[in-house]
């Protein structure tokens, strides 16, 4: 018996391994795997259904069909284990060996492996240095290739067609060797001497100058070195033996009716065997060459189809005309092995059902139908019944359960007690899509779900279904309870704000009970305590909304954690006093002394979590929900058609608009305005009218008149049902109410343009047929968009997860002091995100000093929490350097200090947290809320006119940032730099707003001056680009000849004369080379120089410049000498929403990107070519001038003689992230990408922490390009992992050798995923064939560091509680002990991990 147990134990044992290597299999290796050769194409005998001998299902080779029973039935039972039957030759064993035993086919002629031939770049082609076309001609028997030229004039590797071959035979006889087919290729590969070739290439590379040639050579060198290092031999890419897959992995199943269902692979194998046998026979008969050749070609094609059908030529099809599924198709794509069976599997102990509301549940409970529970917990019930002695055998227990005896229900209740189950709703977009609950048995067939977790699941009760899973092992139950319980997931991992927030009815109820009404019953009464209020309210003596005074006892937690109790009398309402009863001790009364709108409730729960902790918050959230439901029921809020009050002014507003439109139409008819102007004006008018109607409507809805206690008529906030729903945030918005009670407004045509005639009716009045027809397009487009959006958003999430999946917190501190500079995020002058919010939950990288002193007020290494944020705001600090995932120096993974706070838990992140996946989910999950379309700016959308001044919103002190300015004679400043900014700081020195100042802006205030709110502090002309002098003197015209380089124009209206510079293409031949300029001279006519330089003050004038000064005029500092008209910015399509986010993460180069200065220096223009200008920048440090050709149609922001800094914009356009990284560095790139992505999400009102975007960015910046190889083994231009290069450089530095130099490279997320170290992860993502081919040739090792690789090989992932297991294994491995991690040790490590996460 013991023997039997050992046997069973050995069956399930898996080798412990640390890495997986993939490589090419040698023929010997294939034979060593094999249990015999398949010689016949037969499968099974159609009469007996027994496998044929030597066929594709042969029992002698692959093992018995039935457990422990040979084919002929001579040996049966376990006792004969291992015996080989002398009659049928079958070994007696388990039938499951048919899943693992392989066979082989000895090929009569070698065959090239199609992956190494056709998967680009062709490996065989690279090694042999021949083109793919040529190799194919040899392989498919179209031409001969010379293998050994001997003493002839032929060259090795030369191709000969039939004629040339026979000529050569006549000429040289058999002095040379030329063959065709795979044997020729194999010979050539066999003949390659890797060492010699590598040496030759390494010498050749430094001597070549052509870029393309260097690329080609280094590719070839890399491949050769890969072969040499991996122990693969080149000739193994040509197969001489073909392995055969075990038969149970390509099953043949008899269907009823005598037909068979078979795997396509059997057909493909059959083809190969048939052709191979025919070829053997032909060779034995020494058939004519041409027939043999044809058969060999067919064999090559058959093997190609087996390995990768359809890769070359037409795919082989089966009987039903569809292509057969080859081995390659088995592993790639969504239905392939990786994604279908390895990364996700169907699991046992699960069920699904429709969900309904469970308003009476507690937050940690879910209602589980008895029927489901009985099925899910069956084994536990059987065990319990036997243990209790209610059933003697499992069979008896089974019977009891089937009969549903009363005892069974008692046992079920006991089994379920404190056994959590997991609930999951598809699509699981973030980790809150699976949470654990304690089941409560219910009647009925639907699962009951707690309303507060609906937001996390994005669930509603209109027929959604959910799946239930049972965690079986003790560890799994422990994790479910300690980590996944819904009560532990109160905060969202995406932004750290509560996700367990009441919505809809609950919000409405809480809002209703905290509103106040004038002259309600009981107004003005004073109560002794909350209990009295409750009594009086229940007795009906005071209305819910009555204003009263109450004496309350509140306990308030101070910042240092001490608790202060105080008693005071507050002015409040009955409802608020009732609500305060459920508020936990520690929160002040003020939190409920206001109308509770959705935002306020969210803030309340957040504050509660931070002040009194998790447990109290959960109880409080539940109580809030119960209260909300109760009072929304009492309120009786409902919607009737009379709630939509249409404002009386509507008719007047629409009448006025119609009159104005008529006026514009008549202007258009008489030719005063163009079609475009008319269109814009009309649409403007209607937009305005629509806004006015909705303003009037909201004013009408939101107020009502009542009589107060003195009998006067006063206004109070309305109790209109619809207004309350919108105002509280329960449902609906002003925009929706506008369509119901205002006017629907402008609609768009299918092509996106806006129709000039709006829908003036609203839904209460009803639409006419035409109006209804106009509306249909928009409604349908919405539905189509949603479907597209879901797919695109899912794909973006998948790419993000894939790029970041191996990023796990692996250490506490990497010790870097690098970080990102954080400033308040300001947009269009408004502070969108104050500094405090941005640094919350981050670790400070360098000490923060009190402004203007040397006192450290926030030391480096501080984790900023809510109290520090207040402190930072109080001390009016406006920039802080914080640690960031981008700068973390941990080698594998990331450190806790650089990441900061775990947003979902509110403390520093634990080691083992999979921050990469969390980041990917946080960015991907709201993807479905983003828009899909690109916006065409134009018409009503771009009503924001070009800014022409800065008007400050708050009073305060002026601060000027990196602004170069000159002072005009009238005392105003003129900006002469491009990246200047003006900020306003309040009395504490905090920046409240910030504005960009364009070149030539006239600034009417000085640094440090105080301004009032609403003051205009700077002005400029938005339509022209000025050229400003920086010194005073006399104007001299150079090269300005009338009608050759300039033309004079007189304005008809004003009678003033302007000088316009002609475009080069409009000038006569004489003027093509002349460059008109304005020179500044002093009174004596001597040249003046630009301040601080020895460059003469000469301003070259670009084409179309308008000169506003006369020759010889005296001008002062800061005067405008010429203006360049700006084409009003063309209507660029602004890519918005999801496509924009995808573009940023894929690091795509935008079309017509902005041009940045490559070096700092002085601008000049060199010789022009046909369509381009030559821009020359002479660096200030005296190095080589930098030249760049720029198309003439690009509008340049700079002119001759101007100083620019590296990375400044020379020509406007969308920014290219690669340029930002190259010229301005990682921090500038981070700032750009984070802000751009946040802009898209902010527009939709979605909050995501910057950290997540930085985490993904870290993964995009993993690679570097070697610029100088030093003494390392790297080749210039190679892309390497940053960590690899740093480690190598450390080693070189310690040996006093030259280190390699590199530049950072930004990869898009798809590219970054495919270039990861792990080939398993890359292969299961995309382009499986290419990844595996490359990995096999280079003999790659996968060290299984990421999550995905470990999931594929079926291990615990190295994150969370699984990290304990992995680090324990690593420790053991280092100590060289026999590797057996026992369950108890894992348990211990697990509890330790859980304890640390609980603190």
From Swiss-Prot:
Any one GO molecular function term? zinc ion binding
User: What's its top-level EC category?
Assistant: transferase
Cellular component terms (Gene Ontology): DNA-directed RNA polymerase complex
Q: How is the cofactor bound?
A: Binds 1 Mg(2+) ion per subunit. Binds 2 Zn(2+) ions per subunit.
> Does this entry carry the keyword Lipoprotein?
no
The cross-references to InterPro entries, in alphabetical order and at most eight, read: DNA-dir_RpoC_beta_prime, DNA-dir_RpoC_beta_prime_bact, RNA_pol_asu, RNA_pol_N, RNA_pol_Rpb1_1, RNA_pol_Rpb1_3, RNA_pol_Rpb1_3_sf, RNA_pol_Rpb1_4
Q: Which GO terms describe its biological process?
A: DNA-templated transcription
Q: What's the family?
A: Belongs to the RNA polymerase beta' chain family.
Functional summary from the UniProt entry: DNA-dependent RNA polymerase catalyzes the transcription of DNA into RNA using the four ribonucleoside triphosphates as substrates.
Protein's name in the database = DNA-directed RNA polymerase subunit beta'
Q: Which gene encodes it?
A: rpoC
